[in-house]
Amino acid sequence: PRHAIENMYGRADCIIAAGDCDYGVESTVVKIEGEGVVLLRPGAVTPEMLAEVCPVKLSETLNRPVGESVAPESPGMKYRHYAPDVPMYILDGSDEAVYEFLRDKDDCAVICFDGDRELLAREHAFSLGDRADSASHAHRLFAILNDINAQAHDGKIKAVYARMTPAGGVGLAVFNRLIKAAGYNVIKLD
């Protein structure tokens, strides 16, 4: 709740702090279309869960930029959300390629996984948890982005590099938030 209080301070008359969220990603947003739904923004209610009760289509703009002249169908679809105030990039590549790419990068934050020992030894490394634990990634993501932004404001971080996350289940919501925070900047390393 600390980050929510800091982000909303002075903008809300009252803040009720009820503790940490179980998931940490905003709600799932869908649009009813015929007998099914179009997923506009993924969240803790996953496409797989929705598919158990109705047909599900993913919005064409789910993980792509929405044009300036296009009205967003859901909050969070158009603009960089929870993005650090420094450039951010998603790294798409093998462990070795990511380690090599980051080896000579200083003054940057790295969002990685518990198994990334070489990366975790860095001064500004932030772990999302075990690579396969998307629920942990969802729970930790916004706190990590807020911590990075605080350090960026102190001048300690000039850029952010995040490992590509698994996109299944709630991982789709994590990937969606990361890709938007990065302004759709993906560096392919392999």
For each feature predicted by the language model, list its residue ranges.
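Active-site-adjacent structural elements in enzyme catalytic cores
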Residues: 1-190
